[in-house]
């Protein structure tokens, strides 16, 4: 065992290197990640280029002059209502000097005023009186008053234009607002009090209070820039969230079992993205400083703010990846949190929140970052330009600390929830668990201590358990007691394990067997630490699985091979092994040696530099096993370690485990009973979570086996009844198990072995019976399993007590007869559709298929909803904007806007009102009048202040003159936009209070509704965005054919008889209406919301429907053409969407350029299909506009361009048809629309002579040649493969040298007769897959020909039945939907299809799964579905490629029975390929074995066993160890060439050469004598299995010259595909 020491630094470095390689090799994701980041940075630069920043220097006070200096003759006044008081007031206003010559009109009401203004005048001021003291000054929007309500803290309130200084509040003074306000206020005072103050009001003087230096930002671009700052790291958080979530879900638990520390996992991701964040922050800070978005704050402060924000988002992504299990949901939540919390920070920008709440919300890092940015802007706005260039960053430093705190806080929450959430549903983990001292320890000991105290040695008293040999007592390595595991899903409790008790011994290989869902994987997961038991306890080498410290020891001792493959696809084989070696704690200097050892052990040297994603499924499985054996562990926990491996690789794994059995513990699960039989010393059967039995193969076969299988190969002259009579004569309770042409099989009871010598002697001495050869084999573990499962379904409590179940077995003849009857009912020829009726049915089936797929395509639906939502949102926002623009508003002008009330605490930005008395007299009466207005005053009674030098005040009133005649100077802080109108009201009310203390004047400002004069501009702006949106949609809804091609569903449809035109038009029949509906829905929404004057007519709608429909068809079929061309690459819907967008964008730009409009418009409509929507819409809009102005006859010809999309559609249909004919897959039927007929490929002679062939292969070649030339169609086989050869072009190693050809098959000839199932077997690379592809038509043969159903041209079948190795299914469709669609494709009528579906579902027990989506099905049920699809419609030729892979034995039996029932005694033939020899033995009438591209042998299974089987297997079980040596001496005397195999002492195993055993009668006679002499418990003698024959023949592939012509990688991967 290699020394292992867990090292966090080593693990972190290994994982970091893995992440770096991930970035390097997943180039597309890395490119997009950095592209999006770069685009956001470019957006920052763009906004800053458009952004205006004002660095305003300090300025002393500015005198605006007297109020009566206003002089403007361009406006008029309209007032309402008309009352004597309002008339007197306005008459007095008309006498003011600057009102001379101005019109003042009276209006009875506001509606009349608005109408009057809209009809006659453009520059009007409205005066609306509420009462004698309250009125509203109403202006046209944007005229004479500012358009905003108030300055914001960060916006510029003054601008410098050379020597001219302009401040926003001066607009009130300069354009007449305060002049008119002062005149009206003076008139109100005079009318209501009979005291004139007109002179005082007209002498008002305005001044700016001293303007401090400031840096001001400008408006919307600031908000946009801040928003982009918030989402600057979103591309990084998206990819880190997705990567971490996927890796945690798939790999982290498995790596933790190997010893991975949590800190190493998070550090590896954090360090990588920390560096990326550092670089992005550096660039962002540089941009901010270069463009001077922030002036006064130093580089490091800004850098720190951005950097800690980025790190906090990384921590937030980690936290969300723990809380949420799906990567899509994690990405979405992180992005929404970033946007929402960051946008909430705008409340800090506009001071909507109290400071305390701002700091509380800073626990959300996006808000804290936004608060920091706001603080930077405020520093620029408030701090003098000559101050320290670092500013006053105390608040910013506090925010940076909060961001640092947020990052640490999120990390702590990540660690906390990672410990709590996975264990929350088990025992004592609670949310206050973090308060305990053992927070980071997994503690399950509360339920173990009692069990340990009461522990006793467990004895199996049931006779279902074979007693353990004495030599293993005290070698208990794994002890399991009362183990229970419950799963809770949707409030439903499922017991995976139920009180399971078991010991696993050192020095033994133990197999866990059981049906799917029995609990095998759950048990192994509990033992490996991947999940926690509900109750019970486990010790491994005296280490308690419940203790954290013991778990670490266990991880060092254990090698785990889980059911799913463990590897990173973007790493090579060698890199994966190095990574996991370091995770396991193998010392750095030993890693390379250990990796080399594993590569050699598993024969993976040729694949060590291949990326895992390019490996076959079997090679990936082998790599997972290699990772498990890294470090030479003492305990192997293997969950189906050889699933998917070819026989050679499987035997290599078996030999590896056998060689290391002595000092180690091997516990594995498997679905292959033969594997358990050959490899395991002890087999443990689990059913529904309970332990059923355990023992050696011999024990189990004797107790539950059905006996020996006697197989006889017969000549044509044999008489079946005579042979059966002879067998019954010797063994009356024997049973005939199988009968077919040339073959008989019997079951002989185990307890009748004493009768075997006489039976075999009579068989050997009776040549007249027509027996060519015979063989005998012991019952298989599969039969034991089926009998156990049959018993467990009857009685869960007791196995071994019901004799009738043992006799009947789990798979009774009645069940087979039932399956045969159900399937045979389908063999009658149902009437199939043809011609256009079939084409239309296929079209409808594909349309339905496309609808069902879109229903579950989340991304496409999101895109459609998003596009529709954006379009409708744009229309809604345009209407809201129009409504706002056309609506009026009214803003109050009151002192509380800027000034405190008496006794109020200081509250920025409110201040006291400064009163400066420069009259030299007391002004107590005026002061008292001001105090009546509830204003906090600060009075300079002696006039010592200037009043305009202190910018801390919002406003000041400076009184001069004498006590009888005041002169007022109004000084305003330029930051307060409405200061002048407010101070005018304060002065007016001060004067009014002298005469009428209870009265109060109130002035408001408002605007008139704006006229709707932007209709055309609105339409064009909407239209531009709408066209660009629509251009992005087709790639997302019309490129699913790429998915169909890559998962081979398209090939499955083609081989099922689908016409190419029906496939494409069927998809279009659904997609075109969806796309049209999307376009027209936005059109209709626009029309519905448009103003009455812009409503379109029915004729307009007709024209738009015409060109929209044509555009949809043309662009959808253009997308089909693109999909066909790029079907072998990635789908890249987003990239093609971007291309469509760019083409549409530039096309629109050319169309909208006035100079080129007429030329570009017509050219682009005619030549650029994506531009036709925009072009036709713009053309239609222009035709409509021109028709309203002037009639131009030549414009009538422009309507012909609306037919351009239909022309494009026809062109793309023709292109698609030509591509299908030239480059498409071979069709099975004549396409009535595309006019494509099944191709008849040219036949080339095979250049290679078949020298040195086996005689059976030569005979098959002759028979095939005769069948090929036979004129009797009825006698022709279902499949004829004659002289097939396939060559592939190899890659050039040098541009000078010619590339070597790779020969996949050389000269293959065989046929499949009607009613026959032929098995095609071979090692990986032998040529099986290529042969299948040539038969299906997927690959053209280089020489030779294939005939199906008797003819290669005129009478080809309309479709083939094909069950591919990979499940060519749509994951979101249900089983019934699959069956209905394929039935329609094959031409079955609906009534016939429903009957067939029900019967096939009954035959294969699929009734419960008919409504289940495929993605929820087990692998075994998926294989059943693929098989049913292959035989649906009664095809005459069926190809089955490993049909029972992934099934448990029960499912395999169902499948095999269905295959036998489907083809037995019918006119159909089947070709089956498999790696599972038991499957071939169960269903094949004949077997052909391929070696190195050649047919090595062919014949019945018994014939091949007799011809090529070299050995028999003898197993004997002794009662006492003392018998071993004498018995061994006797066996060696009787069988001199016997080879003893390694087993534990009570079980003796020998391999006997065939010549030592023949004749069988003598062999059994000798063994019966031995049994009596040595009092053996039991023995068995069995012929070589087909697997052993296959292995012997396949070894020739390594010895011949086949590899000389092939690249070394051919040994590890399937033969090259033609399309590659």
Curated annotation (Swiss-Prot):
Q: Which reaction does it catalyse?
A: taurocholate(in) + ATP + H2O = taurocholate(out) + ADP + phosphate + H(+); cholesterol(in) + ATP + H2O = cholesterol(out) + ADP + phosphate + H(+)
What is a GO molecular function of this protein? Answer: ATP hydrolysis activity
Per the UniProt entry, what are the Gene Ontology biological process annotations, in alphabetical order?
cholesterol efflux; cholesterol transport; positive regulation of cholesterol efflux; regulation of cholesterol efflux; sphingomyelin biosynthetic process; xenobiotic transport
Q: Which GO terms describe its cellular component?
A: basolateral plasma membrane; endoplasmic reticulum; plasma membrane
In which compartments does the protein localize? Cell membrane; Basolateral cell membrane
Sorted UniProt keywords? ATP-binding, Cell membrane, Glycoprotein, Membrane, Nucleotide-binding, Repeat, Translocase, Transmembrane, Transmembrane helix, Transport
Q: Where does ATP 2 bind?
A: 1322-1329
Task: Give the protein's biological function.
Answer: Mediates cholesterol and taurocholate efflux. Through the interaction with ABCA1 potentiates the cholesterol efflux to lipid-free APOA1, in turn regulates high-density lipoprotein cholesterol levels.
What is the protein name stated in its UniProt record?
Answer: ABC-type organic anion transporter ABCA8A
Q: Please tell me the species this chain comes from.
A: Mus musculus (Mouse)
Q: Which gene encodes it?
A: Abca8a
């Amino acid at each position: 065992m290699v020394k292992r020491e867990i090292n966090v630094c080593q693990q972190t470095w290994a994982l970091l290197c893995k992440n770096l390689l991930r970035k390097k090799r997943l180039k597309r994701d890395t490119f997009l990640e950095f592209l999006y980041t770069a685009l956001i940075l470019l957006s920052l630069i763009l906004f800053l280029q458009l952004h205006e920043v004002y660095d305003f220097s300090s300025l002393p006070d500015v005198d605006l002059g007297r109020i009566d200096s206003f002089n403007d003759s361009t406006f008029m006044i309209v007032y309402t209502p008309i009352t004597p008081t309002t008339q007197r007031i306005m008459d007095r206003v008309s006498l003011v000097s600057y009102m001379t010559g101005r019109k003042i009109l009276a209006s009875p009401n506001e509606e009349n005023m608005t109408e009057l203004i809209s009809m006659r005048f453009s520059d009007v001021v409205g005066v609306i009186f509420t009462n004698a003291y309250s009125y509203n000054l109403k202006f046209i929007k944007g005229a004479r008053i500012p358009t905003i309500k108030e300055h914001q803290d960060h916006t510029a309130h003054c601008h410098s234009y050379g020597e001219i200084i302009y401040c926003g509040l001066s607009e009130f003074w300069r354009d007449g607002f305060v002049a008119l306000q002062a005149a009206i206020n003076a008139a109100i005072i005079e009318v209501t009090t009979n005291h004139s103050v007109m002179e005082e009001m007209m002498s008002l003087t305005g001044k700016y209070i001293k303007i401090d230096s400031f840096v001001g930002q400008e408006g919307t671009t600031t908000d946009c820039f801040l928003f982009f700052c918030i989402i600057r790291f979103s591309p990084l958080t998206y990819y880190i969230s997705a990567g971490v979530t996927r890796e945690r879900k798939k790999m982290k638990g498995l790596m933790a079992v190997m010893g991975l520390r949590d800190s190493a996992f998070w550090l590896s991701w954090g360090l990588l993205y920390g560096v990326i964040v550092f670089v992005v922050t550096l660039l962002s800070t540089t941009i901010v400083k270069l463009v001077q978005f922030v002036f006064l704050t130093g580089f490091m402060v800004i850098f720190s703010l951005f950097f800690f924000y980025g790190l906090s988002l990384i921590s937030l992504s980690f936290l969300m990846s723990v809380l949420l299990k799906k990567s899509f949901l994690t990405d979405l939540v992180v992005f929404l949190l970033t946007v929402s919390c960051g946008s909430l920070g705008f409340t800090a920008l506009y001071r909507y929140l109290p400071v305390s709440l701002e700091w509380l919300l800073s626990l959300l890092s996006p808000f804290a970052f936004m608060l920091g940015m706001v603080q930077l802007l405020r520093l620029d706005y408030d701090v003098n330009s000559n101050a320290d260039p670092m500013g006053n960053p105390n608040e910013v430093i506090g925010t940076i600390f909060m961001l640092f705190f947020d990052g640490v806080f999120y990390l702590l929450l990540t660690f906390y929830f990672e410990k709590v959430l996975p264990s929350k549903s088990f025992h004592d983990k609670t949310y206050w668990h973090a308060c305990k001292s053992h927070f980071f320890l997994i503690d399950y000991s509360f339920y173990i201590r009692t069990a340990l105290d009461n522990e006793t040695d467990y004895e199996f008293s049931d006779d279902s358990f074979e007693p353990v040999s004495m030599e293993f007592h005290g070698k208990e390595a794994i002890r399991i007691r009362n183990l229970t595991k419950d799963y809770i899903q949707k409030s439903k409790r499922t017991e995976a394990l139920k009180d399971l008790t078991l010991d696993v011994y050192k020095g033994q290989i133990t197999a866990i067997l059981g049906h799917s869902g029995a609990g095998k994987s759950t048990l192994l997961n509990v033992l490996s630490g991947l999940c926690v038991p509900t109750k019970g306890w486990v010790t491994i080498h005296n280490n308690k699985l419940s203790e954290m410290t013991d778990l670490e020891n266990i991880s060092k001792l254990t090698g785990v091979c889980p059911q799913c493959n463990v590897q990173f696809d973007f790493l090579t084989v060698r890199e994966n092994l190095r990574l996991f070696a370091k995770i396991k704690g193998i010392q750095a200097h030993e890693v390379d040696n250990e990796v080399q050892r594993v590569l050699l052990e598993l024969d993976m040297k040729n694949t060590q530099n291949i990326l895992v994603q390019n490996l076959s499924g079997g090679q990936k499985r082998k790599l997972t096993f290699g990772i498990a054996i890294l470090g030479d562990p003492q305990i192997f926990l293997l969950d189906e370690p050889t699933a998917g491996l070819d026989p050679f690789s499987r035997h290599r794994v078996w030999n590896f485990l056998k060689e290391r059995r002595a000092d180690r513990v091997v516990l594995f699960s498997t679905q292959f009973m033969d594997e358990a039989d050959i490899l395991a010393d002890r087999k443990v059967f689990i059913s529904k979570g309970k332990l059923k039995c355990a023992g050696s193969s011999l024990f189990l076969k004797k107790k539950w086996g059905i006996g020996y299988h006697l197989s006889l190969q017969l000549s044509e002259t044999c008489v079946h009844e005579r042979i059966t009579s002879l067998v019954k004569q010797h063994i009356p309770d024997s049973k005939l198990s199988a009968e077919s042409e040339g073959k008989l099989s019997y079951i002989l009871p185990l307890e009748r072995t004493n009768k075997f010598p006489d039976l075999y002697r009579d068989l050997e001495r009776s040549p007249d019976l027509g027996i060519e050869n015979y063989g005998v084999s012991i019952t298989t573990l599969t039969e034991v399993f089926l009998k156990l499962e049959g018993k467990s379904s009857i009685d869960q409590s007791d196995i071994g007590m019901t004799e009738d179940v043992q006799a009947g077995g789990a798979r009774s003849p009645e069940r087979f007869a039932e399956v045969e009857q159900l399937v045979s009912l389908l063999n009658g020829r149902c009437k199939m559709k043809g011609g256009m009726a079939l084409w239309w049915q296929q079209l409808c089936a594909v349309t339905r298929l496309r609808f069902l797929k879109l229903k579950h395509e989340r991304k496409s639906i999101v895109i459609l909803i998003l596009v529709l939502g954006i379009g409708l949102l744009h229309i809604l926002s345009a209407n809201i904007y129009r409504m706002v623009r056309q609506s009026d508003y009214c803003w109050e002008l009151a002192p509380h806007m800027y000034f405190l009330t008496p006794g109020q605490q200081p509250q920025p930005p409110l201040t006291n009102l400064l009163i400066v008395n420069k009259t030299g007299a007391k002004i107590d009466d005026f002061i008292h009048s001001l105090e009546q207005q509830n204003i906090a005053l600060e009075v300079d009674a002696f006039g010592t202040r200037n009043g305009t030098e202190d910018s801390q005040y919002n406003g000041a009133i400076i009184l001069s003159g004498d006590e009888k005649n005041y002169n007022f100077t109004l000084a305003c802080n330029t930051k307060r936009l409405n200061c002048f109108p407010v101070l005018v009201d304060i002065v007016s009310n001060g004067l009014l209070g002298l005469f009428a203390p209870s009265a109060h004047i109130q002035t408001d400002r408002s605007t008139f509704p704006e006229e709707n004069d932007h209709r055309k501009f609105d339409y064009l702006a909407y239209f531009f965005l709408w066209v660009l949106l629509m251009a992005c949609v087709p790639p997302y809804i019309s490129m699913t054919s790429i998915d169909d091609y890559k998962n081979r569903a398209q090939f499955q449809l083609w081989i099922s008889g689908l016409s190419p035109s029906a496939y494409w038009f069927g998809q279009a029949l659904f997609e075109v209406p969806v796309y049209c509906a999307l376009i027209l829905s936005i059109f209709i929404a626009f029309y519905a919301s448009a103003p009455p004057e812009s409503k379109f007519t029915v004729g307009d709608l007709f024209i738009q429907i015409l060109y929209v429909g044509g555009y949809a068809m043309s662009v959808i079929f253009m997308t089909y053409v693109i999909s066909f061309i790029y079907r072998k690459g990635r789908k890249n819907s987003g990239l093609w969407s971007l291309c469509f967008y760019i083409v549409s964008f530039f096309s629109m730009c050319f169309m909208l350029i006035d100079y080129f409009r007429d030329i570009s418009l017509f050219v682009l409509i005619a030549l650029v299909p994506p531009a036709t929507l925009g072009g036709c819409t713009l053309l239609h809009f222009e035709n409509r506009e021109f028709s309203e102005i002037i009639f131009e006859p030549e414009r009538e010809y422009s309507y012909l361009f609306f037919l351009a999309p239909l022309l494009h559609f026809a062109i793309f249909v023709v292109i698609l048809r030509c591509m299908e004919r030239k480059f498409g897959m071979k069709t099975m039927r004549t396409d009535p629309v595309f006019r494509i007929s099944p191709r008849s490929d040219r036949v080339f002679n095979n250049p290679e002579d078949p020298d040195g062939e086996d005689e059976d292969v030569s005979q098959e070649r002759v028979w095939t040649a005769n069948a090929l030339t036979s004129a009797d169609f009825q006698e022709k086989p279902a499949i004829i493969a004659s002289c097939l050869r396939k060559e592939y072009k190899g890659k050039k190693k040098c541009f000078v040298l010619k590339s070597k050809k790779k020969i996949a098959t050389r000269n293959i000839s065989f046929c499949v007769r009607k009613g026959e199932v032929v098995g095609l077997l071979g090692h990986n690379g032998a040529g099986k897959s290529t042969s299948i592809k040539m038969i299906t038509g997927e690959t053209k043969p280089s020489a030779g020909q294939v005939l199906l159903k008797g003819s290669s041209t005129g009478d080809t079948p309309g479709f083939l039945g094909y069950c591919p190795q990979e499940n060519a299914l749509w994951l979101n469709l249900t089983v019934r939907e699959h069956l209905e669609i394929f039935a329609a494709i094959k031409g079955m009528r609906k009534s016939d299809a429903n009957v067939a579906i029900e019967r096939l579902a009954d035959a294969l027990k699929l009734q419960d799964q008919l409504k289940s989506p495929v993605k929820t099905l087990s692998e075994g049920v998926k294989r059943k579905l693929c098989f049913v699809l292959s035989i649906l419609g009664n095809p005459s030729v069926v190809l089955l490629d490993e049909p029972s892979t992934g099934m448990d034995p029960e499912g395999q039996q169902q499948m095999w029975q269905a295959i036998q029932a489907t083809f037995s005694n019918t006119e159909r033939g089947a070709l089956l390929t498999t790696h599972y020899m038991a499957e071939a033995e169960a269903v094949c009438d004949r077997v052909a074995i391929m070696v190195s591209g050649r047919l090595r042998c062919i014949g019945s299974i018994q014939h091949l066993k007799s011809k090529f089987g070299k050995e028999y297997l003898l197993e004997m079980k002794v009662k006492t160890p003392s018998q071993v040596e004498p018995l061994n001496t006797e066996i060696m005397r009787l069988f001199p060439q016997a080879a003893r195999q390694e087993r534990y002492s009570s079980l003796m195993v020998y391999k006997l050469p065939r010549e030592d055993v023949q004749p069988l009668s003598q062999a059994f006679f000798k063994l019966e004598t031995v049994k009596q002499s040595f009092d053996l418990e039991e023995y068995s003698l069995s012929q070589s299995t087909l697997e052993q024959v296959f292995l012997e023949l396949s070894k020739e592939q390594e010895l011949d010259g086949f590899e000389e012509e092939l690249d070394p990688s051919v040994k590890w991967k399937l033969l090259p595909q033609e399309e590659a």
